[in-house]
Amino acid sequence: FYGGPVWAAHSDAANATMIDSDDVLLLKPAWPAAGFDLAGKQRPSLADDEKPIQNKPLTGIVVIEIHHLQPGTEADFATRFETETACLMTADARLLAAFVTEHAENSFPRLPVRADENVFISVMGFASTEAHARHQAALAASPAWQDFWQAAQLGLTKQTETLRLLPTSQSLVGR
């Protein structure tokens, strides 16, 4: 991709939209089928789609949590996360993907990867900010989740980062 004609034609414009293109992690799905499942999804055509700024704001949000873990604990964290979150998913809250650090050589050195990181990343979709708040309340009320989270805190090397994103009108994620 980065050596092809599309990137050559649009790299300056794409790079101008990025806050930090040096903050890169090499990731793999946390368990089989944990990557994004976009099968059967299609983008609406621009001609048919109303822009979110015009009369139709997007209500859904995508929440990404980056858990910084002690080396060698990613698999256990992923297994417990998958088990404890499964019972808390609803139609308004769904796990879109989960990733862990891929401990492999960076095969694209032009893009520097932070090789010393050990992370578990969850990507969750919510129907609305209210649905996200309800999900957070359900987590707080779940003894199983609280047990998992208290134990997980011991394996974190720094505070969990939380990113909240609004899917664009053309996004396949969060639809």
Task: Identify what each model region corresponds to.
Residues 33-34, 41-107, 115-125, 129, ...:
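Surface-exposed interaction/gating patches
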Residues 1-32, 83, 87-97, 112-119, ...:
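An amphipathic, aromatic/His-enriched active-site/gating alpha helix that lines ligand/cofactor pockets
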